Amino acid sequence: MDIMKDKIRQALSELDILATEVQIDQWLDYLKLLEKWNKVYNMTAIKNIDEMLVKHLFDSLAVAKYIKGDSTVDVGTGGGLPGVVLAILYPQHQFTLVDSVGKKIMFLKNVKKSLSLNNINPINTRIENLEGNFDNIISRAFSSVDTFYELCKHFLTEHNQMLAMKGRDLEERNLESLPLNIEKYSIKVPFLNAERNLIVMRKKL
């Protein structure tokens, strides 16, 4: 476990993120819960906690600096990625975690209780049925960018942003058709030799 903690500290340093030992323990406790539930409920395709450390934890932390304001909705959150990871980092920020699969929300309610994460609100619904005001609308491996926009455009205002976490495929053709101001960022994930990108979308003024 000390080796994993050292790896987290190194990743935090590379990402220029300050975190406490309590937060590091919370991230590890979360991954252990995810690994445990995964054996029964198939929460994620990644089964090994060492692999989860990089492909889930570090991948989620790599977009932390792009989160603005006080509230975020995590669309198709699955096992809580990136929402739970970011909620541990930003305890004053409210995260609404949305998924249509009941067992995943059941898991997230367990995470909330086990880790005393009072700033997450897991909701079992389809995103198009949710109402609310959020500074960030984020998705990771949820859908194509144009589908993400169509399902979530009712949240978009002049003051907030949509963030799509993507791999190599930036869906350039889909992006060109969207009536939005779009910025693309190349994301470096510590210990991961794979292309990661973040697409930030805002309403045209």
From Swiss-Prot:
Locations listed in the record: Cytoplasm
Transmembrane segments: none
E.C. number: 2.1.1.170
Alphabetical keyword list: Cytoplasm, Methyltransferase, rRNA processing, S-adenosyl-L-methionine, Transferase
Record GO cellular component, one term: cytosol
Catalysis: reaction(s): guanosine(527) in 16S rRNA + S-adenosyl-L-methionine = N(7)-methylguanosine(527) in 16S rRNA + S-adenosyl-L-homocysteine
One Gene Ontology MF term: rRNA (guanine-N7-)-methyltransferase activity
Residue sites binding S-adenosyl-L-methionine per the record: G76, L81, I127, E128, R140
SUPFAM superfamilies, per database record: S-adenosyl-L-methionine-dependent methyltransferases
Pfam families: GidB
General function of this protein: Specifically methylates the N7 position of guanine in position 527 of 16S rRNA.
Family to which the UniProt record says this protein belongs: Belongs to the methyltransferase superfamily. RNA methyltransferase RsmG family.
Protein name: Ribosomal RNA small subunit methyltransferase G
Organism of derivation: Francisella tularensis subsp. novicida (strain U112)
Upper lineage: Bacteria, Pseudomonadati, Pseudomonadota, Gammaproteobacteria, Thiotrichales
